[in-house]
């Protein structure tokens, strides 16, 4: 195969050169001659061909600049017909012909009649021809690297195509490179406008290009021809009218299709890039010395093109020995795939037209035909419908990822292959019969079953892919030539799914995707998609199937391509083992005794653990159709439930068609995470806390809710019984505590009053009125005469009252200000001594300079502490400076990032046992090798936990594959080791154990001053100084270094877990870490540690096998009861990123900020508005709702200007704004948030303050989807009526207590002076 390919236009240019006759002669018809057989290509022939190709390339390069020759051949001259003369009217022939055409186009009514064209193929050819006229090759270092296309008024080419356009007028033009796409454009000379193509809009339909059709659907461009290659970058994509809709950039495989990356255009020449992530730019590298590239394989010291060997020597059906030798000699060649396809398909010069022209279907046919390089085999099956047997469909291995239901099985037969090894239908099965011959059967009714019938997805060669339900055994059954065969083996099929949020089957109606692992069904040309085959083992057959004897004449029937071997003993000769390889042979033997017949296939087959160990030399490699790969899988997104609010709860209701996971977590320090699988009809009530809660329904985006203010039945502004109902529902603990204390005090007061009354009635009788009461009584009486003092009285009135009534209290109140005045006067008295050096001309001059400098650099500083919660409302403030217009300031947290410092200790995955086929020593002893890694099954694999045992007294007198005739002298070597599963190379199937040392916390804060936005990055370990537009911002450090990650974490797929994993080298069977490695070579790690509990057992004597047990994968067991991932349990609402390992948007901590605003940012007021006569009316109010209150403020403005409006009351935010003030009456309507049923806030407008007060109604909704700006009700609020009732009750109790205390004192005093009355 030569690398140089001619396009159609090149052929057209070279037609005159290759034509045998001149242009004016008629060329006779030449029938197709038989294709000449190609001679064997040697080194001398390759050199000669290289020289010829170099000369031919130079000739073609010279022809490229010449004028284009009409491709139409000479017209055939019609004999016996004279040429028509010109008409007598004197018209020229051209004018007459033009006139006739115009008349033909017009109908009877003068309308143009358009001919219908039923030749779509011709339209395609015309469009491609038009595209060729506007397409020019681009040469780079002597080779075509791509193409450039003239479209509209510009010439376009991909930016990755280097070189000059092969046209004198376009060679030196300068291109402009697009910023956001792989495209270059330039203007071309006006003389070439006739060659430019018209643009058209690329839509979802089928288009044309050089090699066939291109299908566009949902921004996915598929090359239906599959013939695109390097060097095609820049080729035009046209519609049937010849208009260009795009140019090709490159392509790549997408399953069985070829997907393209293109630049699409529209009618206005606007370009857009439709990229495919796995596409490779189709630019061609420069040729090296213009020599053809030949992919070389070797055979008998001769080199040849791997994809085109001489079919006389290579065809595996004609010369199987030569073909197998050729495959064996080129096993390590990187182009072995091409050689394998060539020797098994044996393509001729003319192929039969296939029904399906799909490249994928043709490629599948080649893959099936490649199985002709191997033969099927028979192996031991432990259960063939109740008994053990040697079965043609014996199950050798079963592979499962453990995370889904798909199984990959390997059997001894070959699916989709004919008896000779060619490609067959899906129901065909190639197998090795009991007679040692290879057969093929159609309509085999292949069935795979576990606990129920499996869905067979695909069967290629020895491998079957099926979707099976879980079970403890696996059965494969097929009908072969009318006989039903089945094989059952023990296999524990369990599905251990990783963390998932939905368990759907077929409900993938969304565009959401995620990385997943599956078995690849698209073979690729790489070593990963090949499997080794070894020398075939002999199978035992009955002697009558291969030898027939008549008296002393015996005939041996040898199946084609096999070797027959048996023991022969004649009458007068000793016993001997004879071998026959030809088709039919005859020998003479008197009284023959023929035993131990066996047939060995000439072609190799796969190594099987159910057969004894055979040859160790790899004979060939055949396709391995289903290796695991990481793919992008679509996932379902469950419909959201109906969400309603009831008090401070969220109600979810609906019907789930399949299991959906509902997870909740609080957004505070204690996440209190919950998870529940829901299916069918459901109704769930979820309480919402003031800190917030996060709900995640299936694969939908998380939803956040906050409880605003809880409310209750009853009335907070009514009588005591309604107050009791309200507060009992709202704050039951406080309400019942208050009722209990009040009842207790009343009971105590009542008891004391009763006791006092019973004692006083005797004292009053014995004592007369005391005109000089004791001082305590007088003092108690004087308390009633003390004037009351209100808290809202002026300070001077209070001082005057204290001076009049209590000199001691006055002195205490006056001591602090007097001390302050004394300190100030003392400092002023000594000020002259401190400032003496500054008095004078120098001092005053320096002072003036400092004052001037300070005045020039003066700025305004605003400080604030911002909570580090991106979900929190932004901080808003109005900056009021005397003499300047107000400025609005907004600060919000854009995101937070917690980045831990990690170290990968090891990775783990599913461990599997690898078994060396049994080494059987018949009538002799065998032993384990000193280096177990030299065993063939362990070669090329990373192994650990290797066990090798020698078993004696095995297989006594066993006939079959072992051929042991001894009873007790037979021995067997059994070797088993642990290795990594083939799924370990996929990221989603591998768990990584990290140790976390420290974490860095970063946040981005957006500061908006007026219309200017400044982004500041703040850190936990220092102060950040940033400058915006005339702003200087000093922020940080963040007040906490909180991290949701523990010291040990595990990452698997897209989830992260806090888990205390075992150290490296300390794994135990069946637990996390039973397979450990640190190497980045996941297929063959050189530091593998494994312990899967392998135990080698004594084999039973019914068949040759290796008996062992092991523990199932510890990773799969850990996934069964794994803790919840951090994406569910992380506190503070952290979002967890697995790769890289980060925690995002954690709502914890705060950051102090200082913002220096220069005077230049402020606008000086020319006149102060001086608002006066302020009045505020609360129009409406709902408490517990963001900006649920509305207020109207009226005031009089003395001058026009600007004023900032904001709230001075903590906990009652006002929608801050800057208002325009006009001279005269002004009205401002604003909103505020109130957390309580009664609101009283002070509003400041340009240093004028007005008080707004009113009553609020309960909110309609008590759960909100955004974090409220007002403070949540902590439970300590008591309404005004409740306070008055409570104050009245408490005051009454206090008065009663004081009265009782006075009575008690009076009684006590009276008792001390009472007169005892003695009856006479």
Curated annotation (Swiss-Prot):
Residues of the site described as Cleavage: 282-283, 353-354, 791-792, 859-860
Q: What is its EC number?
A: 3.4.21.90
* Catalytic activity entry: Autocatalytic release of the core protein from the N-terminus of the togavirus structural polyprotein by hydrolysis of a -Trp-|-Ser- bond
Query: What is the uppermost EC class here?
Result: hydrolase
Q: Where do the record's region annotations for Binding to the viral RNA lie? A: 101-135
* Annotated site residue numbers, Involved in dimerization of the capsid protein: 207, 240
**Signal peptide start and end residues:** none
Q: Name one GO molecular function term.
A: structural molecule activity
Extracellular topological intervals: 1-734, 792-807, 858-1286
Q: Where is this region: Host transcription inhibition?
A: 48-81
Segments of skewed composition (Basic and acidic residues): 101-113
Lipid anchor positions (S-palmitoyl cysteine):
784-785
* Region Disordered, residue ranges: 17-41, 65-125
Could you list the residue ranges that cross the membrane?
Answer: 735-755, 808-828, 837-857, 1287-1307
Q: Which UniProt keywords apply?
A: Capsid protein, Cleavage on pair of basic residues, Disulfide bond, Fusion of virus membrane with host endosomal membrane, Fusion of virus membrane with host membrane, Glycoprotein, Host cell membrane, Host cytoplasm, Host endoplasmic reticulum, Host Golgi apparatus, Host membrane, Host nucleus, Host-virus interaction, Hydrolase, Ion channel, Ion transport, Lipoprotein, Membrane, Palmitate, Protease, RNA-binding, Serine protease, T=4 icosahedral capsid protein, Transmembrane, Transmembrane helix, Transport, Viral attachment to host cell, Viral attachment to host entry receptor, Viral ion channel, Viral penetration into host cytoplasm, Virion, Virus entry into host cell
Q: Where is the region E1 fusion peptide loop?
A: 954-971
What UniProt notes about the protein's domains is:
Structural polyprotein: As soon as the capsid protein has been autocleaved, an internal uncleaved signal peptide directs the remaining polyprotein to the endoplasmic reticulum.
Q: What else is known?
A: Structural polyprotein: Translated from a subgenomic RNA synthesized during togavirus replication.
Query: By what name is this protein known?
Result: Structural polyprotein
Record organism:
Alphavirus salmon subtype 1
Query: Taxonomic lineage of this organism?
Result: Viruses, Riboviria, Orthornavirae, Kitrinoviricota, Alsuviricetes
């Amino acid at each position: 195969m030569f690398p140089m390919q001619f396009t159609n236009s090149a052929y057209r240019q070279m037609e005159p050169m290759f034509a045998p006759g001149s242009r004016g002669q008629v060329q006779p018809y030449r029938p197709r001659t038989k294709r000449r057989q190609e001679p064997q290509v040697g080194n001398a022939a390759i050199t000669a061909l290289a020289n010829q190709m170099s000369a031919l390339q130079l000739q073609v390069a010279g022809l490229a600049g010449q004028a284009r020759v009409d491709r139409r051949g000479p017209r055939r001259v019609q004999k016996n017909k004279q040429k028509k003369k010109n008409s007598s009217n004197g018209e020229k022939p051209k004018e007459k012909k033009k006139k006739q055409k115009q008349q033909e186009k017009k109908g009877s009514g003068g309308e143009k009649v358009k001919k219908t064209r039923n030749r779509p193929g011709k339209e395609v050819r015309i469009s491609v021809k038009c595209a060729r006229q506007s397409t020019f090759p681009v040469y780079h270092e002597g080779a075509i690297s791509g193409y450039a296309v003239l479209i509209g008024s510009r010439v376009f080419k991909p930016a990755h195509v280097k070189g000059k356009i092969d046209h004198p007028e376009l060679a030196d033009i300068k291109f402009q490179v697009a910023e956001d796409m792989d495209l270059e454009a330039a203007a071309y000379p006006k003389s070439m406008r006739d060659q430019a193509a018209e643009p058209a809009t690329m839509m979802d339909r089928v288009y044309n290009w050089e090699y066939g059709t291109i299908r566009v659907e949902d921004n996915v461009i598929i090359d239906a021809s599959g013939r695109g290659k390097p060097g095609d970058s820049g080729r035009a994509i046209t519609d049937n009218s010849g208009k260009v809709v795009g140019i090709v950039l490159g392509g790549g495989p997408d399953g069985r299709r070829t997907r393209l990356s293109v630049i699409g255009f529209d009618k206005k020449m606007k370009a857009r890039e439709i990229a495919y992530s796995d596409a490779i730019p189709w630019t061609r590298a420069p040729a090296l010395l213009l020599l053809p590239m030949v992919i070389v394989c070797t055979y008998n010291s001769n080199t040849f093109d791997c994809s085109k060997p001489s079919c006389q020597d290579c065809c595996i059906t004609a010369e199987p020995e030569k073909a197998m030798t050729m495959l064996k000699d080129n096993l390590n060649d990187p182009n072995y795939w091409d050689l394998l396809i060539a020797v098994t398909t044996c393509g001729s010069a003319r192929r039969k037209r296939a029904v399906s022209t799909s490249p994928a279907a043709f490629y599948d046919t080649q893959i099936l035909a490649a199985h002709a390089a191997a033969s099927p085999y028979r192996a031991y099956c432990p259960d063939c419908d109740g008994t053990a047997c040697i079965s043609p469909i014996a199950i050798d291995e079963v592979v499962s990822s453990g995370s889904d239901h798909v199984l990959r099985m390997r059997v001894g037969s070959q699916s989709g292959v004919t008896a000779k090894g060619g490609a067959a239908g899906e129901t065909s099965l190639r197998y090795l019969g009991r007679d040692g011959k290879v057969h093929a059967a159609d309509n085999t009714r292949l069935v795979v079953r576990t606990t129920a019938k499996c869905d067979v997805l695909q069967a290629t060669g020895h491998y079957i892919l099926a979707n099976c339900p879980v079970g403890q055994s696996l059965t494969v059954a097929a009908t072969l030539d009318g006989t039903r065969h089945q094989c059952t083996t023990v296999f524990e099929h369990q599905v251990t799914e990783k963390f998932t949020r939905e368990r759907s089957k077929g409900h993938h109606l969304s565009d959401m995707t995620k990385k997943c692992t599956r078995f690849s069904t698209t073979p690729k040309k790489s070593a990963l998609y090949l499997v080794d085959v070894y020398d075939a083992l002999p199978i035992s057959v009955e002697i009558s199937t291969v030898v027939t004897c008549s008296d002393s004449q015996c005939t041996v029937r040898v199946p084609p391509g096999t070797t027959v071997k048996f023991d022969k003993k004649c009458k007068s000769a000793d016993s001997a083992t004879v071998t026959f390889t030809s088709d039919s042979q005859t020998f003479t033997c008197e009284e023959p005794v023929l035993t131990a017949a066996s047939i060995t296939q000439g072609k190799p087959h796969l190594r099987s653990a159910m057969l004894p160990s055979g040859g160790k030399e790899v004979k060939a490699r055949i396709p391995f159709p289903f290796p695991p790969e990481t793919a992008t899988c679509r996932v379902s997104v469950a419909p959201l439930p109906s969400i309603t609010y009831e008090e401070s709860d969220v109600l979810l209701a609906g019907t789930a068609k399949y299991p959906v996971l509902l997870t909740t977590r609080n957004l505070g320090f204690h996440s209190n995470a919950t998870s529940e699988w829901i299916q069918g009809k459901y109704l769930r009530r979820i309480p919402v806390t003031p800190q917030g809660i996060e709900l995640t329904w299936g694969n939908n985006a998380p939803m956040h809710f906050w409880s605003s203010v809880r409310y209750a039945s009853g009335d907070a502004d009514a009588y005591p019984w309604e107050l009791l109902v309200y507060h009992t529902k709202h704050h039951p603990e406080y309400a019942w505590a208050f009722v209990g204390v009040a009842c207790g005090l009343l009971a105590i007061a009542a008891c004391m009053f009763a006791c006092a009354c019973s004692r006083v009635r005797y004292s009053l009788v014995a004592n007369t009125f005391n005109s000089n009461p004791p001082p305590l009584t007088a003092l108690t009486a004087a308390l009633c005469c003390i004037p009351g003092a209100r808290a809202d009285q002026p300070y001077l009135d209070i001082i005057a009252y204290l001076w009049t009534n209590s000199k001691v209290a006055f002195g205490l109140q006056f001591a602090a200000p007097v001390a302050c005045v004394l300190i100030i006067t003392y400092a002023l008295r000594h000020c002259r001594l401190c400032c003496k050096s500054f008095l004078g001309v120098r001092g005053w001059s320096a002072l003036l300079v400092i004052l001037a400098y300070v005045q020039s650099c003066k700025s305004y500083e605003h400080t604030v502490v911002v909570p580090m919660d991106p979900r929190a409302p932004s901080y808003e403030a109005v900056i009021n400076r005397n003499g300047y217009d107000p400025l609005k300031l907004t600060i919000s947290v854009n995101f937070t990032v917690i980045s831990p410092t990690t170290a990968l200790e090891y990775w783990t995955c599913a461990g599997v046992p690898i078994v060396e086929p049994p080494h059987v020593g018949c009538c002799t002893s065998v032993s384990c090798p000193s280096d177990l890694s030299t065993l063939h099954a362990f070669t090329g694999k990373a192994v650990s936990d290797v066990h090798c045992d020698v078993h004696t007294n095995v297989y006594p007198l066993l006939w079959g594959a072992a051929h042991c005739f001894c009873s007790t002298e037979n021995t067997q070597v059994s070797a088993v080791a642990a290795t990594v599963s083939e799924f370990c190379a996929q990221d989603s199937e591998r768990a990584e154990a990290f140790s976390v040392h420290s974490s860095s916390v970063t946040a981005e804060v957006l500061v908006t001053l007026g219309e200017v936005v400044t982004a500041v990055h703040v850190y936990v370990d220092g102060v950040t100084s940033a400058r915006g537009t005339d702003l200087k911002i000093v922020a940080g450090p963040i007040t906490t270094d909180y991290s949701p990650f523990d010291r040990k974490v595990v990452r698997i797929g897209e989830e992260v877990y806090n888990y205390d994993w075992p150290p490296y080298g300390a794994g135990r069977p069946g637990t996390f870490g039973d397979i450990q490695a640190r190497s980045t070579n996941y297929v063959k790690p050189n530091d593998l540690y494994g312990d899967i509990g392998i135990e080698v057992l004594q084999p039973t004597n019914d068949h040759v096998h290796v008996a062992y047990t092991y523990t199932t994968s510890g990773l799969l067991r850990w996934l069964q009861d794994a803790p919840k991932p951090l994406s569910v349990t992380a506190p503070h609402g952290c979002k967890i990123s697995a790769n890289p390992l980060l925690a995002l948007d954690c709502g914890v901590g705060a950051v102090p900020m200082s913002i220096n605003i220069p005077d230049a940012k402020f606008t000086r007021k020319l006149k102060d508005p001086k608002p006066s006569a302020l009045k505020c009316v609360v129009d409406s109010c709902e408490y517990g709702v963001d900006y649920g209150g509305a207020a109207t403020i009226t005031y009089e403005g003395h001058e026009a200007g600007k004023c900032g409006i904001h709230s001075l009351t903590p906990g009652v935010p006002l929608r801050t704004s800057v208002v325009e003030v006009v001279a005269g009456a002004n009205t401002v309507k604003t909103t505020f948030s109130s957390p309580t049923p009664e609101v009283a806030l002070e509003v400041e407008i340009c240093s004028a303050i007005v008080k707004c007060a009113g009553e609020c109604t309960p909110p309609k909704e008590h759960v909100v989807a955004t974090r409220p700006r007002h403070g949540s009700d902590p439970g300590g609020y008591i309404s005004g009526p409740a306070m008055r009732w409570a104050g009245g009750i408490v005051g009454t109790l206090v008065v009663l207590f004081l009265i009782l205390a006075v009575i008690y004192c009076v009684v006590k005093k009276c008792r001390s002076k009472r007169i005892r009355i003695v009856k006479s």
